[in-house]
UniProtKB/Swiss-Prot annotation:
This is Oleosin-B3. Its main location: other. Residues 111-150 are annotated as: 4 X 10 AA tandem repeats of I-P-[EV]-S-I-K-P-S-N-[IV]. Residues 38-119 are annotated as: Hydrophobic.
Length: 424
């Protein structure tokens, strides 16, 4: 070992010595040798990096190209790969099974041919022969309960049910139409009356001594007269009639071109400048007609709880109610509330600037005091009038409009006239 090591060291020393001896002989080659090393190293590095770059770029390009191709063709490639794999595995296994190396092993083991799997299971107990034909699924399920037949039966039953429902609905609609045709337009004018506007049913009883106005007359600025007695008549030439009282028949003319009558036991009718019919009366056949061509200022509600006959459409935004015998009135051009009880009540607003209001107190015998104020082109407010009657009391107040009227006991009538005058 020592000799070998010594020989190797001697050889290396000799080569180094020869190199150094070469450069000692040609010392001018040392700088050139350094230059050569630098050039070779640079060229080698460029070549090396070039190969590396080409390799990397080639792989990158291959990846960039192959990835979208794989994505595009994957629906075909993947099943094809799977099928190829399965097929190759199957064929390979078949070849392996058919290889001559398998049979010698069996023959060497000495397994006789009679106990091979294909011969062990007798034909009689194979699954195909064990299950009899009668209990196979195709024979167990009867034809009547197959899904297709069940669906048909369900559709038939649904169709029958729908036809029955339609027949019942038609019968009901026929019955309703017959009832409605039979029940239209019937009204009774005694204590109990029917209102076509579905204002409700009610009964009212007037006490004796409806109202007695003090005798008097007033002349309006345009020649209208207002006389009030047991049965009063108010007539002014303002384009319509408005009458109200204990047992009155008459009315006064409104600027809306209509006639309005209401009272304890009146027969009369009036036309308002609004759409609908209004009939009111204590225990009367008749009443007032609210027949009009136009509409009141806004939509509203008309209710009569006494024993009125008929009904009307009030386009106003207020409420018209009567709790006692009857009530007739309307609201023109604005909203508000008009209520009356006892015998009768009528009120309205005229197209003129002034206002004609009345305020009265009624005692048990029906004596009345009337007081009214009239102003030109001004808006006044009706104050609340209270009365006592043998049957009922009522209040009337304004809601959202500057007009209104209230009556109790006998009657109170409010109207707005465009002309000057007094009403006593």
């Amino acid at each position: 070992m020592r000799n070998e090591i010594q020989n190797e060291t001697a050889q290396t020393d000799q080569t180094q010595g020869s190199m150094f001896s070469f450069f000692n002989l040609f010392p001018f080659l040392l700088p050139m040798f350094e230059v050569i090393k630098m050039v070779v190293a640079s060229v080698a590095s460029v070549v090396y990096l070039g190969f590396a770059g080409v390799t990397l770029s080639g792989s990158a390009v291959a990846l960039a190209v192959s990835t979208p191709l794989f994505i595009i063709f994957s629906p075909i490639l993947l099943p094809a790969i799977a099928a190829t794999t399965v097929l190759a595995a199957g064929l390979g296994s078949k070849k392996v099974a058919a290889a001559p190396a398998a049979s010698p092993s069996l023959s060497l083991l000495g397994i006789p041919e009679s106990i091979k799997p294909s011969n062990v299971i007798p034909e009689s107990i194979k699954p195909s022969n064990i299950i009899p034909e009668s209990i196979k699924p195709s024979n167990i399920i009867p034809v009547s309960i197959k899904p297709s037949n069940i669906k048909d039966k369900i559709k038939d039953t649904i169709g029958k049910v729908k036809n029955k429902i339609k027949a019942k609905q038609e019968e009901k609609s026929k019955g309703k139409s017959e009832d409605s045709s039979k029940g239209k337009g019937k009204s009774k004018g005694e204590d109990t009356t029917t209102d076509e506007d579905k204002h409700g049913k009610g009964e009212s009883k007037h006490g004796k001594g409806e109202s007695k106005h003090g005798k008097g007359e007033s002349t309006h600025g345009k020649g209208g007269k207002h006389g009030s007695e047991g049965s009063s008549m108010d007539e002014g030439k303002h384009g319509g009639k408005h009458g109200s009282g204990g047992s009155p028949m008459g009315g006064g003319k409104h600027g809306s071109g209509g006639k309005h009558e209401s009272g304890g036991s009146p027969m009369g009718g009036g036309k308002h400048g609004s759409g609908g019919k209004h009939e009111s009366g204590g225990a009367s056949m008749g009443g007032g007609k609210h027949e009009s061509v136009g509409k009141h200022g806004s939509g509203g509600k008309h209710e009569s709880g006494g024993s009125p006959m008929g009904g009307g459409k009030h386009g106003s935004g207020g409420k018209h109610e009567s709790g006692g015998a009857s009530m007739g009135g309307g609201k023109h051009g604005s909203g508000g509330r008009h209520e009356g009880g006892g015998s009768a009540m009528g009120g309205g607003k005229h197209g003129s600037g002034g206002k004609h209001g009345s305020e009265g107190k009624h005692g048990g015998e029906g004596s009345s005091m009337g007081k009214n104020s009239l102003s030109k082109n001004k808006k006044e407010f009706h104050y609340r009038g209270q009365a006592m009657d043998a049957s009922s009391t009522s209040e009337s107040s304004d809601g959202s409009s500057s007009d209104g009227s209230s009556s109790d006991g006998s009657s109170s009538d409010g109207s707005s006239h465009g002309s000057g005058g007094k009403h006593i």
